[in-house]
Amino acid sequence: MDITLANFQLKAIADLTAAMKKPNRDIILKSCTGSGKTIILTHFMDEYFKSNHKKVFIWLTPGKGNLEEQSKEKMDRYIHGSQTKLLSDIMTSGFEENDACFINWEKLTKKGNNALKDSERTNFIEHIRNALDDGLTFKIIVDESHQNDTIKADDIIELFHSDKIIRCSATPKNYKNAILIDIPEEDVIAEGLIKKLLIINENFEQHISVDDQITYLLDKAIVKQRELHSEYLNRKADINPLIIVQIPNKSDALLDRVEEYFESKGIT
């Protein structure tokens, strides 16, 4: 998939590449939602592999939602011939040069998961040791780093003996002696990736009582989406506006309700 990178994305890749040559272990990539963080990082890894040998990237993701699978799929799509792996692939074949490995760190610490326990097959820690013995070195990317700042996550990171950790977040915490790469939101807006204007609850009735707030808001969203779609068609533009529903962390019940709503409308 050919992608034309925005100027700020190209600069971020150049800044990451330069930061990897400096002695600082921690690199903070601060990027707002909509800046194309995954595009930046996957292209950065691809460029880094081309000029650095015997390297493996470990991309750690938090929690539920299969973020590691989504990120892997994006790299497969963005970077032709990329060498990506999930945890299951690592447990089968270990680490190899130029691997980009996408791992949900909580799966390694979850009770009942034997990935970090002795077993008949070579376990996860032994795969790391074998890679290090073979002369491979690991570079770490911590996605949504503000959610990964836990003792258990740090324990996983330390297993790789990495001299470089890239921590990505829209709201990063402070790290001593870290290199900060900050993508200005105005640069993202200028490139048209996100909008400068946000209209909240346009033409909503005021001071009304509703039986089901979730259904009410989603109904409104669908009506607005159809209005916009119709207007685009009138202008002979084949654009189908997207409805984005932001759900708080650990709100599985709310997520289920939203999914059931869209299924009832034939939207899946």
Q: What is the predicted role of each segment?
A:
Residues 147-197:
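Post-DEXD/H (motif II) to motif III coupling segment of the RecA-like Helicase ATP-binding lobe
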